[in-house]
Amino acid sequence: MRWDAQALNAQAVDAEALNAETPRTGTQAPDGQTAPLPAPALLPLAGLVRSVTTPEFAGVTFHEVTAKSVLNKVAAGSRMPFEWTINPYRGCSHACVYCFARKTHTYLDFDAGLDFDSQVVVKVNAAEVLRRELAKPSWQRHQVALGTNTDPYQRAEGRYQLMPGIIRALADSGTPLSILTKGTLLARDIPLLKHAATQVPVGVGISLAMTDEQLSEAVEPGTPGPRARLKLISRLREAGLPCGVMAMPILPWLSDSDEALDSLFGSLAAAGATGVSAGALYLKPGTREWFMQWIAREHPQLAGKYRRLYGGGSYASKEYRAWLAGRVRFFKARHGFIGSTGFSHEDIDQDPRDEEARYPAGSLPGSARIRHGRGTAGSVGHSGTGESAAEPVAAQPTLF
Ligand code: SF4
């Protein structure tokens, strides 16, 4: 068993084997305190084999579990463009302050804040169980999406290496797949994905909503930064794989200026992204509290504005969303993007107890279903040419 020497209460280190993807900062609470090393987990996690810590993942505990099943059926009536998902990890050390999968961690008796970032459940037998499930005569080979709830290429994947087995199992069974991630560790699996694309439709999406490195480091501290993700998009395109981008969330007053949007869409076009969907920050319960604490600490002058803009709900005002959709359309056109693509791992929860597990109408302005074709899944028309629109720059609504 991996990390045998690092089980809690026996914290030896296997640094060489750890993921090379280094986070820019450690897990931080919104009050600015670095997360303390967690106490040994004594939670009644189903299938828990053991809990592991290591200094290379300071403050993070991995709970290795054996899963009975890894294929999740999306709730009936969902607006998501796929029926099945796999989440090899629960919780995510990418630690995005705005992550709206946070609430799902409470179903495991963890909290939606620091625990989501630092108590990561790892389904160590995911590939093996998946092969069994895919071999059932009843399996109809519908598309399976990875990255719908938490990031499958978060840092732990460098160590646990669950994704290669999952990709192989899906492709070998003739099941189309799509992946959404912020993790540059995906580059490791490009050859495998290229091969899989000769067997089944394969879609790849990168989540990137800002080019400001400093802002990214503050709001998504465990992720590879924007430059690294842009490089990943280029590598995917060079490998002949399509690469859509989820430009969500656009953060009011922080990443929604014309300069920021121009830089974002221009950079995505230059990197060769095949499509992009963009939308405003969505603050569902569990995320809202965490994000508002962060805003109050990092940008206290914006705290009141955010409160008024969201009015205690999950969505920015209709007026703001309409304004942002217009700016997005303008800058997409300027940089040659047509239409939109994809889905977001921030945009769906898998737990049936969550009534908001359904893709919330209007939460993804302009988004469209992924349309698969062999080797082109997830792509939409990006002409790559800067179709310059002459629309004058609109002023932000004055409401806020
Ligand atoms: S938004 Fe995605 S990458 Fe960020 S913490 Fe959530 S699941 Fe991880």
Feature roles, as predicted:
Residues M1-T66, N72-K73, D258-F400:
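Auxiliary Fe-S-binding modules of radical SAM enzymes
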Residues R50-R90, V97-G205, A209-E217, P226-S234:
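Conserved Radical SAM active-site core
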Residues T184-A187, L251-D262:
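Active-site glycine- and acidic-residue-rich loops that bind
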